[in-house]
Amino acid sequence: MDLNEMRARYEREEGYSCLNATARVCQDVILSKLAASGMRDRVTVKGGVLMCALSGSGRRATQDIDLDFARYPMTDASIRSFVSALSNLGDGVTVRIAGEIEELSQQDYKGRRVNLKVSDGRSTFDTKLDLGVHASAAMEQDELWFDVAHRQEGVCLLANSKEQVFAEKLKSLLRHGIRTAPETRFMERFMENPPNLATVQSLLDWGGREPSRQGQLTGGYSCLDLEPLENLRGVLSQIDI
C-alpha cells in the first residue's frame, strides 16, 4: 500500500479535501488490517464508518474510527496488543500508538481513545481510534462489506446490527437532533426498510431519564413505545432538527 497514492486518488477521483482523504486512507488501512488479523471476530465496527456503510454515502465527514471489543479486555496492555496485531501483518504498513491511551467518558458512552501513527515507510498519517466494549456480547453481530480503496472486493467485518445502530442513534437524536447527512440518510433508509422494532425497543435502556432541550418529548425515554411503526414516525416528528 502506498498511502500518498491512496490519498491522492481520493482527492483526484472523489473530490476529497486533503484532511478527509487522509482520514479515509487511515480507515481503509485499519479496516483491511482488522479483516486480515486474528482479531476480526473479537471486534465490531460502529460509529461514523458503519453509518456511512449502511447509508451508502462516502466517509468524507468521518475522521475517527469507532470499534467495540467483544470478548476482549479493555486494558492498556490488551489495547497495545491489539494495535501490535494490526501492525505486524507483513503488508508494508505499520501502526503504532502515539502518546498515552486516553479515557473517554460522555453522557452515554465510556471507552478509550488511541492516537495512531500509520506509516508505509515513506509517509506517516495520523488518526484516532475510539474503543468501547460491546454492551451485549450475547447478541449476534452482522457481517458487512466495507469499501476500501486498494481492494476491489472490499473487506467483510463484524458490525453492530441495524437494530443496535438505530437504538443508539435514536438516543442521540432525542438528545441532540440530526446533525449530519449520513444520519439523515440512515433515518430515511430505516423508515423505508425498518428492522425489527421489538428488538430496537429491547435495546433501549433509558431508565426514565429526561431528554435534552432539543427534541423535547413528554416524559422520560423509557415511556417510548416503538410498536407499531406509526409510533416511531411520531417520535421522529417531534425531534427538533
Explain the meaning of each model-derived region:
Residues 1-43, 52-61, 65, 69-241:
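Structured mid-to-C-terminal alpha-helical surface segments
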